[in-house]
């Protein structure tokens, strides 16, 4: 955790209430926070009679590492369990979330599983943009086929809630092998597949929820942090943005000239967004504004690329 004082109590408490597990430990690393993160986490750990919760202070970030990757790598070295559960501080899980996820993992004979939490949006911008990631998965990937594949290009993951078999994680190299990758969740899933380990994203909306941002400024900063890398390189971003424009914005632009064609394509994209929202219990009321959301997403992609090229991207006080 880095400067997560508002999330410390909720994160640790929801994790500590897990049932259906024979044994578990909660490891918290304070990544050189400048707020009360360590104090709050340490106080919670000391208030528990058992040694379930352990709090560590992170050291200086080594050269070549990104902060989150080094923190997770450090925690993985301290962990003693058969499974590693990586959980963002802003995620809240219900009491059976981990046991249910592990059961699904075992039933499919996977090495990792990534339950996608229900996204809680605060404000218009978050409700407009946040559902796009889930929609992009469901509209461009056949997840049932992707989860059976070992092709790294079909891997999808969400680092908010990620469970992996500890032995397989270490065999593939773990976060040390992706120490400088800003999209650590996706790169870890690709790394697992390169090592012939299967896994997938699953709908986690019934067992977990996440409020990533509290205002529009945080959302913009969060998207800026990673979108420059989301599609491989600038050419990939241009190609994806062009496809998004053609499929989601162009139908609206041609309505005055080719009303029926434009309306048909708009309704198709609208229904795909609604179908995803219903399936994942995500935000529905912004679905009619999908073209606006896509326009904003394209803007954020190229804003991220621009700022990365200027070397002016920062996250939690560290340059990316």
Q: What do the predicted segments below correspond to?
A:
Residues 13-23:
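Short, acidic, metal-binding catalytic loop of nucleotide-sugar glycosyltransferases
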Residues 244-312:
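Membrane-embedded multi-pass helical conduit in multi-pass membrane proteins
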Residues 30-40, 60:
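A conserved acidic beta->alpha catalytic loop
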Residues 80-83:
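Short acidic donor-binding loop at the edge of a beta-strand
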Residues 55-74, 100-163, 167-171, 286-297, ...:
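Long helical/loop segments within the catalytic core of UDP-sugar-dependent glycosyltransferases
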Residues 36, 89-104:
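Acidic donor-binding/catalytic loop of UDP-sugar-dependent glycosyltransferases
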Residues 105-108, 112-137, 167-170, 175-237:
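Catalytic donor/gating beta->alpha subdomain of glycosyltransferases that bind UDP-sugars
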